[in-house]
Amino acid sequence: MELILQLYLLPYNPLRPVICFDERPCFLIGDRIKGLEMKKGEVAKENYAYTKHGSCCVLAAIEPLTGKRFAHIRPQRRRVEFAEFMKDLADLYPDAEKIIVVLDNLNTHNFSSFFHTFDAQTAAKLMDRFEFVFTPKSASWLNMVEIEFSALSRQCLNRRISVSYTHLRAHETAR
């Protein structure tokens, strides 16, 4: 725990940026029956019936000292998605000697994901670019990206999202 707190206290170093990473499931659920219109002074009424449009995974990272945010939406949360996200992250920091990533102990969060996804040479290069710092068990709250997910959930994800993964992905790539 102290190691992560010490990382957050370090001054900004573009050669060794500190990035916080995590992922979150997102369920794509729409209304089957339209709710009642809201009247003045009353709350909106939603019907309990819904339609499922599948699920997806939001992968996100923040750089706390600069405020930079990165996100991907993917249909699943596997080692392939993790490795591809880390490769994209490495591409965003071409001059960095080491990218320090704070993340939890999920089974996909390791260097073997690189070797599973990419050829050995690419995986080895990626492995050299990263230093993983894992949050202690039951202490994922130390990861600052959790604050971002909390805000994102309250503002967007904790409601019915009545679009398909394809539509949501098209919206992500349009930004």
Please give the residue ranges for each predicted region.
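Acidic/histidine-rich, metal-coordinating catalytic segments
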Residues: 97-109
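Single conserved hydrophobic/aromatic residue that forms the stacking wall/gate
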Residues: 167-170, 174-175
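Short catalytic/ligand-binding loop motif for oxyanion handling, primarily in non-cytosolic enzymes
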Residues: 27-29, 108-111, 141-142
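Short, polar/flexible loop-turn hinges at active-site or ligand-entry regions and domain interfaces
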Residues: 156-165
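RNase H-like two-metal-ion nuclease catalytic core shared by retroviral integrases
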Residues: 104-105, 132-154
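Extended, low-complexity cationic-aromatic segments
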Residues: 1-87
